[in-house]
Amino acid sequence: MWTDDGVFAEDMKQICATEWIPWEKLEGKTLLITGATGLIGYTLVSALLYANRERGLHMTILALVRDEERAKARFAGQETDGLHWIVGDMLNIPTIEQSIDYIVHGASQTGSKAFVREPVETIKIAFKGTCDLLELAKEKRVLGFVYLSSMEVYGYPPKGHKVKESDSCCLSPLDVRSSYPIGKLQCENLCCAYASEYGVPVMIARLTQTFGPGVNYDDTRVFAEFARCVKEKRDIVLKTKGETERSYLYTADAAAALLAIMLKGQPGQAYNVADESTYCSIAEMAQRVAQMGGIDVRYDIQDERKNGYLAVLFMNLDTSLLKELDWEPIKHTEKNILDRPNALLDMYSRMIRGMNEW
């Protein structure tokens, strides 16, 4: 069972052992989590289940999923005491009779191509789902609500600028791909409105691109493709020049950050969530990963916008506010990564190891 062995188990143990998470606040509580089968949601639910077992917290976890059988398959092999499935989606959230103490809203459209091909659905899913969940939070008088937003709400900051939560953004409503970031911004404003008008304790997590164990092998995002290339011993093929620069985030660090925000955050506040030490360009990341895996990098430049890719951006997130909640990235012990410590390659090494466990 993964909870007793392997890289994912290591992550769960490290999260559970994190003392700056006030676990006592979760004792006997009920949590509703949307997006529970997604990468971040899955890691969070798994960590909560592990902590439930190891710390005897007696939590109840309500996981809103579209397909119960798929969800059961995703969590197969785990001890799922306390986990209950609620079948529905963001456009049709079923009635929930149980009391709810905390909500983590992670369900969202995530495929870049869908932002362009299905922009109406992208906006509807974001706004209606968030609105209905905030109404539920108000009704249940929850103790905390975390909305998972995105670094994309900042638009295109200038190169060399450290992006803070107070920064304004510039997004074009005439760009169809803005369906995703503007949808996120709209939901953020709705969260702040509920906090102001109704006193709902809502916090916002603006996450950078996140990866680690638990990534589906056929995930289409660039980090998963790089990992597959290493495992399959084939060259990395970049379809852009790879000029975009950003920081990244490990899945276990994301889950720990969400718990810190939920239990220690300030209502109405947004928090950048990233590992600042991983900041680099996509091209640089490709070269590092290729060197680690003994493969090469080739270029096959294509129309970026047609495929839903972001234009070149420089997203260097400042995580000072999150660190004020005592959060810090987990220090792993990966060895022999180009004979030097490197957080980004450490994340890749653990993700690739984790692919063997699924």
Regions found by a protein language model. Name each.
Residues M1-D4, V230-W358:
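C-terminal substrate-binding subdomain of Rossmann-fold SDR/epimerase-dehydratase oxidoreductases
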Residues M1-L31, I352:
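Non-catalytic terminal and boundary segments that flank Rossmann-like NAD(P)-dependent oxidoreductase
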Residues T30-Y50:
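N-terminal Rossmann NAD(P)H-binding glycine-rich loop of SDR-like oxidoreductase domains
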Residues V87-I125:
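NAD(P)H-binding glycine-rich loop region in Rossmannoid oxidoreductase-like domains
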Residues C131-R177:
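Conserved Rossmann-fold NAD(P)-dependent oxidoreductase catalytic core, especially the SDR/UDP-sugar
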Residues S179, G183:
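Active-site helix of classical SDR
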